[in-house]
């Protein structure tokens, strides 16, 4: 069970993946403190409506919340500067990479970044797998 684990979901653009992740994580780890940070307000609002405990927007919110998180979840682009059509700044990518948190990255092949060796799967399967991994990590942490 995810008791008091701090799970941070980061997404950008329209927040569609983040919304799905938040919804799945809220079901898988109902006791987790689920924070959503969007690179823009549209993404943040989508994740908040999906069940995040709280949401914030922007570079500083990513940096601050990465320091506080036990687990960070999002598309693989959150560790690549200039990914998500330029929404991920170098400071955001560095904050995710340098965080002491465990990272669960969803392999989305978009924006000129490709993950080889991972078969293409529907987003719903990737989201379910990510939620399961976070649940396992939360059980190990808690």
Regions flagged by a language model, labelled:
Residues 19, 23, 27, 49, ...:
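Short, well-ordered alpha-helices that flank and scaffold nucleotide-derived cofactor binding pockets
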Residues 31-32, 98-103:
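A short helix->loop->beta-strand "cap" motif at the edges of active sites that frequently abuts
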Residues 1-5:
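Conserved small/polar residues in nucleotide/adenosyl-binding loops
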Residues 10-13, 37-40, 58-60, 75-77, ...:
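Fold-independent oxyanion-binding glycine-rich loops
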């Amino acid at each position: 069970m995810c008791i008091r684990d701090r799970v941070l979901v980061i997404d950008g653009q329209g927040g569609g993946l983040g919304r799905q992740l938040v919804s799945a994580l809220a079901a898988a780890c109902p006791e987790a403190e689920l924070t959503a940070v969007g690179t823009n307000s549209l993404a943040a609002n989508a994740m908040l409506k999906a069940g995040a405990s709280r949401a914030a927007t922007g570079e500083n919110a990513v940096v601050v919340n990465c320091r506080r998180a036990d687990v960070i979840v999002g598309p693989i682009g959150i560790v690549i500067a200039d990914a998500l059509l330029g929404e991920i700044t170098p400071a955001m990518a560095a904050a995710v990479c340098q965080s002491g948190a465990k990272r669960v990255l969803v392999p989305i092949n978009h924006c000129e970044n490709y993950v080889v060796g991972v078969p293409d799967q529907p987003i719903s399967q990737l989201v379910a797998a990510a939620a399961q991994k976070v649940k396992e990590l939360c059980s190990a942490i808690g």
